[in-house]
Amino acid sequence: HYYKVAAVRDISIAVEDGKIVTLIGSNGAGKTTTLRAVSGLKHPTTGEIRFSGERIDKLPSHKINALGIAMVPEGRRVFPQMTVIENLLTGAYLRKDKDDIQKDLEEVVFKHFPRLKERTKQAAGTLSGGEQQMLAMGRALMSAPKLLLLDEPSLGLSPIMCGQIAAIIRNIHAEGRTVVLVEQNARLALALAQHAYVIETGDIVLSGPAEELRENDEVKKAYLGG
């Protein structure tokens, strides 16, 4: 709930290990609220959320992050006055395996985002929108997550940059990470995901394999321009 308004109601979502699951729907449908609930930024008033069998809906966000869930928020939310490397290291703040942080920086983050390696000493606020999106994703990966929550990663990006971000999401998934993707660009989301949920005004109205939803007449009409 936000104040007395129910943002989502009776939502039941299952995310299989190693899959990309997408939530699509119009603005205000409840997609971001769902991600915020999973990450601990918003606590549900009823129901429960489980991760790897453990109930997490009462936990604070830093404990949820420590369990292996990282969120890339809508709008990137990088720290503009801090350098690229400083932003990335904030993602590793809660890690106990300090010896592996430098290794992950080189073998995970800079492998997926070589552009960030060229800009480690640059202030994050001077990066382009696409580079800031890469930085936000890299920061999340520095927490070594099992589950990556992506909120509108293509928002405000050029078509070319959208394609690059999509390719990076595929590569991250190919390494075995589970991804939940919230995306208004339904065409992109359904191309990336294996399973999809359509949310409207806080309710799930459709769900199924992404390839089936791509061919669904209602989905085509409402979200795919035809």
Predicted stretch roles:
Residues 123-127, 131:
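Conserved ABC ATPase signature
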Residues 140-141:
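ABC ATPase C-loop
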Residues 2-3, 21, 44, 58-59, ...:
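ABC-type ATPase nucleotide-binding domains, specifically the catalytic core motifs of the NBD
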Residues 144:
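Conserved catalytic motifs of ABC-family nucleotide-binding domains
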Residues 24-26:
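The feature captures the beta-strand-to-loop junction immediately N-terminal to the Walker
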Residues 39:
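Helix-to-loop junction immediately C-terminal to a conserved catalytic motif
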Residues 47-55, 67, 100-106, 111:
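Conserved ABC transporter NBD signature motif
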